[in-house]
């Protein structure tokens, strides 16, 4: 958020984003995207220098209006450092947005093994133990983050899109909603705020002519949405989400991920997610996108 009432320049404003999260989850890539969007990016700036950098940005004549700081878990007392930075910035009427990057344990292990690097908290432990230790350490940070991005199944272009949607312009007037389909057989999405199970609908997998298709095909979509209760479910769920979104806005939260799950993430969840996105887009104060996490995995 922007800050003002700085002693040196009452009209000064600066937007601050703190990028943190699990090592190997894409903090560096997120920082590069923010830099491409015109943000001034400070990578691994010591916590005690963050407020100094903000003061520099608030000073008369400074051209820094958007500051992104990548915070590294390897700094001792990391969680306390983050809390301290937030308190200091609050004295300047600045409430930074915190972006938390994460990925599944399996994906993090794969990335470290591919790059032949050790985890910063690994020490004499195994790689998996180092990842688990970091996840425990950062749990309080994740719990208070403004935006959580799970990069497990996210390509670099997909990550870029997520960052651009959140920070590419003035998002203060809108709430960004991601409707994510998934398959329960592959696990719950780690970044979901709300999870809905649509396995109560008949499975197109058992219809021979629909089995090889997906929820993006009209035949499957018509089959799923034509089931008794499907239309009423969508209308009811749309009203429920309206209440939730209003609550998010009152609390100052601007990002929400709604996960829709079926068995394999191929038919029912995809069709329902697409239909729900269409209903939500009728709200002019919502920026909505759909993401099909497990489509193509079968």
UniProtKB/Swiss-Prot annotation:
Source species of the chain: Mycobacterium leprae (strain TN)
The keyword DNA repair is assigned to this record: no
Name listed for the protein in its UniProt record: Nucleotide-binding protein ML0563
Record-stated family: Belongs to the RapZ-like family.
Superkingdom: Bacteria
Entry annotated with the keyword Cytoplasm: no
Record GO terms (molecular function): ATP binding; GTP binding
Binding-site residues, ATP: 21-28
Function: Displays ATPase and GTPase activities.
Keywords: ATP-binding, GTP-binding, Nucleotide-binding
Residues the record lists as binding GTP: 72-75
Stored InterPro entries: P-loop_NTPase, RapZ-like, RapZ-like_N, RapZ_C
């Amino acid at each position: 958020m922007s800050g003002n009432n700085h002693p040196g320049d009452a009209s000064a404003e600066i937007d601050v984003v703190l990028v943190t999260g699990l090592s190997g989850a894409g903090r560096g890539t997120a920082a590069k995207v923010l830099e491409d969007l015109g943000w001034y990016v400070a990578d691994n700036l010591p916590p005690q220098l963050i407020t100094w950098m903000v003061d520099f940005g608030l000073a008369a004549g400074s051209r820094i209006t958007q500051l992104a700081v990548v915070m590294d878990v390897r700094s001792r007392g990391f969680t306390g450092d983050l809390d301290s930075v937030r308190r200091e910035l609050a004295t300047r009427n600045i409430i930074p947005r915190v972006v938390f990057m994460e990925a599944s344990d399996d994906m993090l292990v794969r990335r470290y093994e591919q790059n032949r690097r050790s985890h910063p908290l690994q020490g004499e432990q195994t790689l998996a133990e180092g990842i688990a230790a970091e996840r425990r350490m950062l749990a309080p940070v994740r719990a208070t983050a403004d935006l959580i991005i799970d990069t497990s199944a996210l390509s670099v272009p997909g990550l870029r899109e997520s960052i651009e949607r959140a920070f590419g312009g003035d998002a203060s007037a809108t709430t960004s909603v991601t409707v994510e389909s998934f398959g329960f057989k592959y696990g719950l999405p780690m970044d979901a705020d709300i999870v809905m199970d649509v396995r109560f609908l008949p499975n197109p997998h058992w219809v021979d002519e629909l089995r090889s298709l997906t929820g993006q095909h009209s035949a499957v979509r018509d089959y799923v949405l034509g089931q008794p209760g499907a239309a009423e479910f969508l209308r009811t769920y749309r009203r429920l989400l309206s209440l939730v979104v209003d609550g998010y806005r009152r609390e100052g939260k601007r990002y929400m991920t709604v996960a829709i799950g079926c068995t394999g993430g191929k038919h029912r969840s995809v069709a329902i997610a697409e239909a729900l996105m269409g209903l939500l887009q009728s709200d002019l104060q919502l920026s909505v996108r759909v993401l099909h996490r497990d489509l193509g995995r079968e």
